[in-house]
Amino acid sequence: MSVVATATTVETGHAHPSVNRPNLTSVGTIIWLSSELMFFAALFAMYFTLRSVTGPDFWSEKADALNIPFSATNTTILVLSSLTCQLGVFAAERGDVKKLRMWFIVTFVMGAIFIGGQVFEYTELVKHEGISLSSDPYGSAFYLTTGFHGLHVTGGLIAFLLVLGRTYAARRFTHEQATAAIVVSYYWHFVDVVWIGLFATIYLIK
């Protein structure tokens, strides 16, 4: 979504307030996401440092244990959830609270499926491959990078619940609720993009 200042309309009864972007909330969110980007950059740096220290052969051998088709499917679900999230934002900008709820619920379910897939993958790696957080440098790098991302996705799921809860608790859909939906979408798109980078780095580059 573009962060260039544009005006959108949210219909709330007879009033027609506009959501002007960027506003202080949106700008603050973008600044915060910039700091999060630095955090993930540090995780990427750690990953490549451990890989260079242990050697490519060791890393490639460990990476062979990953179930790439399963992870690719899980990744596709997360990426598609970015589309459903954006459809929810478009509904919020139109003041269509029913469509906002529908698309945000779909997004929440897809995000929850992604997290469930990660938990399943962790279980399989620990049980059948012996790869754990403390097993070796590869395990440490794998679980730290994907685990911290999973925590961020979980945070996004909580944010969706809060936005949805406000739409049910309030008597009418307001400017503030539309802004909240937009801000949550910024965060969700961010974690999706970060995961694409992680997936390419961890699962595809050997």
UniProtKB/Swiss-Prot annotation:
The entry's keywords: Cell membrane, Membrane, Translocase, Transmembrane, Transmembrane helix
Catalytic activity from the UniProt record: 4 Fe(II)-[cytochrome c] + O2 + 8 H(+)(in) = 4 Fe(III)-[cytochrome c] + 2 H2O + 4 H(+)(out)
Main subcellular location of this protein, as a coarse class: membrane
Enzyme Commission numbers on file: 7.1.1.9
Enzyme class: translocase
Membrane topology: Multi-pass membrane protein
Transmembrane intervals: 30-50, 72-92, 102-122, 144-164, 182-202
GO CC term (a single one): plasma membrane
PROSITE patterns the record matches: COX3
An example Gene Ontology biological process: aerobic electron transport chain
Gene3D superfamilies, alphabetized: Cytochrome c oxidase, subunit III, four-helix bundle
Subcellular location: Cell membrane
Family: Belongs to the cytochrome c oxidase subunit 3 family.
Protein known as: Probable cytochrome c oxidase subunit 3
Source organism: Streptomyces coelicolor (strain ATCC BAA-471 / A3(2) / M145)
